[in-house]
């Protein structure tokens, strides 16, 4: 019997609390969003591009300038410190068809010499395979 009384009391208090919650929710202002009005556009790309080096192909889609930052200052600095990273970047340079002469104006002498060594080693590995 006491269990029934406790359960009834619990349900009654739960209903009272939920009614109070609903009353406080009704006072909340709802602001309209301009994003919903333009649902068909991509929000992050809806701005106009001005000076970026991005080409638009014949389908109207962006094409990134591949290899445009191969010789950025941060990459060159990291290559001087981290030999594993340097080897990965050397492989990228090689994949883009850059010779030692191509990279010379962009890199310090130490990296130019290291790249020449890298290419010689890769050549020997390919010959021996």
Swiss-Prot record:
It is found in: Secreted; Host cytoplasm; Host cell membrane. Keywords: Host cell membrane, Host cytoplasm, Host membrane, Membrane, Secreted, Signal. Residues 1-16 form the signal peptide. It comes from the Eukaryota. InterPro entries: RXLR (IPR031825). Pfam families: RXLR (PF16810). A motif (RxLR-dEER) lies at residues 42-64. One of its GO terms (cellular component) is host cell cytoplasm. The keyword Signal applies. Effector that suppresses flg22-induced post-translational MAP kinase activation in tomato but not in Arabidopsis. The perception of highly conserved pathogen- or microbe-associated molecular patterns (PAMPs/MAMPs), such as flg22, triggers converging signaling pathways recruiting MAP kinase cascades and inducing transcriptional re-programming, yielding a generic antimicrobial response. Belongs to the RxLR effector family. The RxLR-dEER motif acts to carry the protein into the host cell cytoplasm through binding to cell surface phosphatidylinositol-3-phosphate. This is RxLR effector protein SFI6. It comes from Phytophthora infestans (strain T30-4) (Potato late blight agent). The gene is SFI6.
